[in-house]
Amino acid sequence: MPNLLFGVESHHHRLAILDWQGPLIAKGMFDVALLLGQNTKIEVRQKEEKQLLERYLVGLKTYGVQGLTFDFIWDDYRRCTLYTWVYAAGVAGTLDPTNEAGRAWMGQMVSRQSSASEDLKVFDLLPS
């Protein structure tokens, strides 16, 4: 990802993320779902997802957010993962299909989104 900046010296942050591609007003979990569901290798997400969400919850509590449980965070993550299909469809519609790099990126994004959706059973959230 060209918007992931990795620190190379000891005084740098290990990772900085710059995201200006699709500015919108949304809950923070939407960004978490996008990062984990579409931009993280499937096997890494599967292995680290719950630990990262636990860390996210600790961070929220550290900065004064109260009343959240892991179960709430998990359910919110699943809902936001379902919603990120809207983002994937919007981005796909704006890419130039003749651009090889864009096509490869989109293929990875959809593959990862599909895997996350299946793993998290997000379609079970839809009314029947």
Language-model segments: residues:
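Active-site acidic catalytic loop and adjacent metal/ATP-binding pocket
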Residues: 1-28
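Active-site activation/catalytic loop segments of kinase-like enzymes and analogous catalytic loops
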Residues: 22-65, 81-103
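Intracellular signaling interfaces of 7-transmembrane GPCRs
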Residues: 64-72
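Regulatory N- and C-terminal appendages and interdomain linkers associated
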Residues: 11-13, 71-128
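Secondary-structure junction/capping motif
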Residues: 4, 27, 69, 103-106
